[in-house]
């Protein structure tokens, strides 16, 4: 039998950092942990783009702000994002207009243009060095290189995006052989890790405080408790900016599952970084609308080459290991089929995206009646655009300012779901039902631990218990409860990222059970001796 590792203390390393072009894996602790009780006007949980955008606005307005980050700045999904800042919409403006009318589509366009402008303003005012540059965006279709986007163009014009136009792209290798596309001028790309580092510095300069390695265990509208036992008072508001909002206990989790988490489905987006000759690919953002959709743009690779970032192959999070296939290989084949000058693959990673049924984010007052608690989630993969918009809406709400976009992004709004359960996302229901069935159904055939490859994991049945087993590179096995600490869904091994994912609400844990992101705030329970 494979060697069973003795019980170990949790490591002091940072779980969940990835090797991407932004060097997220090199992020170091720059701010102290909170080691005492504290009091603030506003407490922000999470140092991603939503949390830091809100914190900066609040600190500049004179509020005493404390940001509590469970790992380090940029360790979350913003630090994994592809780096594009866009007013493009994953629903498309044509669908938005047909579903909600031109007025709402116009508000969506205005909100995203405003978010892009706000990012630019922050970078300029705070002098953030984050490789920011403005580029054009193009909607294309790989299935029809000469596609006509007349209906979408008209909808974008109706939404106020008058500079968008159908253009000739010439069909050369610089544009991936595409002959025609829909131009969206004045988009931007940046390094999200450097941007968040700059935002955190700006928060401190404005009088706020940032605390790293300070995980919140539970919270209410005016009090929070950390995993270290520190109590933090929030005199005016709590902002929960943790991607998928964390919850405090079983009852809180169950209520939020209906009121918030169930309104969206948690998905995984894969990305790769490919080496290409300097200047051989047009410096733009390409949004390929064919199925499955892809996004392509460049990052700086230094003097010798560029890095082509290709994102896509979205899938529901928490699938069984055998259902993943080869998403990174599919992304590379997609790129090579269009840009034959592609050289080797430099990076591969993924990140979590949350998708409400309307594909519009949820930013503002927590729909669960906690006066003074605000949440930001549901960016649909528009991580920087949606996160900036969400942080701004939340800051305005805390300050009592009117925001023209608050209603269309309200977490408490009624979504257009199924007729008999209009607030719940049907894929959320399906994924949850599947997980519950897998949880209560005995697993008749277990993976043979001896055959489990090093640095791999699987879920097995031991008596009445489901066990998450990880075999490390040295062949030692580690066992944990495969039950998600949030609401008890069955975790699955993610072979692409080598972590444990929850298919229901989005909690993620590293290979040795350490919490990466919520809604769970707990690590997996070790099960020493269960494999003996």
State the predicted function of each range.
Residues 1-42, 60, 524-528:
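Extreme N-terminal leader/targeting segments of oxidoreductases
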Residues 6-23, 91-97, 121-201:
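Flavin (FAD/FMN) cofactor-binding and adjacent substrate-gating region
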Residues 40-67:
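N-terminal Rossmann-like FAD-binding beta1-loop-alpha1 element of flavoenzymes
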Residues 60-80:
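Glycine-rich FAD pyrophosphate-binding loop
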Residues 155, 181-236, 241:
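Helical element adjacent to the flavin cofactor pocket in flavoenzyme catalytic cores
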Residues 186, 291, 316-423, 480:
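C-terminal catalytic lobe of FAD-dependent flavoproteins
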Residues 218-299, 450:
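Flavin-dependent oxidoreductases
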Residues 458-532:
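Rieske [2Fe-2S] iron-sulfur-binding domain
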